[in-house]
């Protein structure tokens, strides 16, 4: 019987397959910035500058160039509603951890009043719950492990009470949150901390409405640059310098243009058709239906916020009716075609 060392020697001496034949995924602990950028760009369309900024921040942290007493990166994502801020963080979690929902997400709307601050850092000594050290954070998800960094998302950070924002300073600067009982702490030093904000959205929306009014006069304005200026000014006005200066990367996401809106619409349709394909239902959605969903699902001011609802009501509803009519029982394959007829989508059996 061969010794274990001989077995390992034989295994290590085997020919290494060429790079093009090596199988995905990337080994544990490895990092490929180009692969991450490609994966994020395939899901977050129209925001290449934001994707590049996030990948750059993660790359700097991965090589160990960051301060070990702080989080791996403090990244602030800012932009109008419905442009993919939260979805970008979910896609990062999908690539760095086990899935898009494998992150610690804190909705700062729930901390809008001062007396809710206890749920952020725990109850102080002498108050009910101080011994339990209850907080909103999942310690295992936040602290991660040597090969899997944590992902923490503070969603709509501007909605939190100033008391919570002051407590957040120690997370951004010291990389840890000391609980109010003074006996325990949670480390964020192996985590990427993301913050999202809608600051400046009102000004951007008003500028967008003004731009739509000016189209008739053919008045051309530089939309991305002007929008970034409005958002940056809103950030500097709202956040104190000591908070804003603790952010490593401020990423401003752009509004969607027509081409990006079409790409996002097709991605959302693909999610529906993929789910149906697993059940043996093949749905072909033609260009007229895509254009209808894009027109009804996108708002010039609020972006893609209502797109999923539109796809559910305008596409998924007639598809469900056709499936129940054509395949009431059984699991035999079914092919359907969806096309726009007027302001509705007609679904029928494919020839």
From Swiss-Prot:
Keywords tagged on the record: ATP-binding, Chaperone, Nucleotide-binding
Pfam families, sorted: AAA_2, ClpB_D2-small
CDD domains: RecA-like_ClpB_Hsp104-like
Family indicated by similarity: Belongs to the ClpA/ClpB family.
Residues binding ATP: 79-86
The organism's place on the tree of life at top rank: Bacteria
The protein's name in its UniProt record: ATP-dependent protease ATP-binding subunit-like protein
Cellular component GO terms held in the UniProt record: cytoplasm
One BP term from GO: cellular response to heat
InterPro entries: AAA+_ATPase, ATPase_AAA_core, Clp_ATPase_C, ClpA/B, ClpA_ClpB, P-loop_NTPase
Disordered: annotated segments: 1-26
């Amino acid at each position: 019987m061969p010794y274990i060392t001989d077995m390992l020697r034989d295994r290590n001496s085997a020919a290494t397959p060429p790079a093009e034949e090596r199988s995905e995924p990337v080994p544990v602990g490895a990092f490929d910035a180009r692969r991450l950028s490609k994966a994020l760009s395939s899901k977050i369309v129209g925001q290449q500058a934001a994707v590049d900024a996030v990948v750059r921040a993660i790359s700097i942290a991965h090589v160990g160039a960051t301060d070990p007493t702080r989080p791996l990166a403090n990244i602030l994502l800012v932009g109008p509603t419905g442009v993919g801020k939260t979805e970008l963080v979910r896609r990062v979690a999908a690539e760095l951890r086990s899935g898009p929902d494998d992150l610690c997400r804190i909705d700062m709307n729930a901390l809008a009043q001062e007396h809710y601050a206890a749920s952020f850092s725990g109850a102080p000594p002498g108050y009910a719950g101080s011994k339990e050290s209850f907080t909103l954070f999942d310690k295992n998800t936040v602290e991660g492990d040597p090969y899997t960094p944590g992902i923490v998302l503070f969603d709509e950070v501007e909605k939190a009470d100033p008391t919570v924002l002051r407590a957040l300073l120690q997370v951004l600067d010291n990389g840890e949150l000391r609980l109010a009982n003074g006996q325990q702490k949670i480390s964020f030093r192996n985590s990427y901390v993301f913050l999202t904000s809608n600051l400046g959205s009102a000004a951007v929306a008003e500028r967008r409405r003004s731009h739509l009014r000016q189209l008739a006069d053919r008045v051309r304005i530089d939309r991305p640059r002007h929008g970034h200026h409005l958002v940056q000014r809103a950030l500097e006005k709202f956040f104190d310098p000591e908070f804003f200066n603790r952010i490593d990367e401020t990423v401003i996401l752009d509004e969607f243009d027509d081409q990006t809106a079409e790409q996002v619409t097709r991605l959302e349709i693909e999610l529906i058709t993929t789910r149906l394909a697993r059940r043996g239902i093949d749905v072909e959605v033609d260009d007229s239906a895509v254009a209808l969903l894009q027109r009804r699902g996108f708002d010039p001011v609020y972006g893609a916020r209502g797109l999923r609802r539109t796809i559910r009501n305008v596409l998924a509803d007639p598809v469900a009716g056709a499936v129940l009519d054509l395949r009431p029982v059984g699991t035999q394959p079914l092919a359907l075609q969806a096309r726009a007829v007027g302001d509705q989508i007609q679904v029928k059996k494919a020839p």
